[in-house]
Amino acid sequence: LTAAFVATPKTQPVASGGQMLQARQIGGVSLLTNAKGLTLYWFAPDSPNKSVCYGSCAAYWPPVAGNASAGPGVTGTIGTIKRTDGTTQATYDGHPLYTYIGDSAPGQDGGNNINLNGGLWHDVPVAGG
């Protein structure tokens, strides 16, 4: 018997405003995660402080919504951008942040180096975390 994982997109961001971002060891690397321990990602086609991930892209890669703050081990600059749909999205060193619907539990890093929705996705290493 073979089981297959099928990710179903959600229409609402899985992250909410006012959360603390943290550094977490995943696969021997210190990565940026949300307050629930889910790995955060950045999208190569985004430009500094501007997201191009909307529609079906945002369904698979929910933007980290609202304001965020830096928790222990987070050394970069946390900020926000205003998306073209009027919502606010958290950023790290100017990169808009996203979660990945394929990551269902803390410590997973399934979205790293995936070429999907028009570009390459990367996890966010945190120096010194």
State where each predicted segment sits.
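Compact beta-sheet-dominated domain cores in extracellular/mature segments
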Residues: 1-129
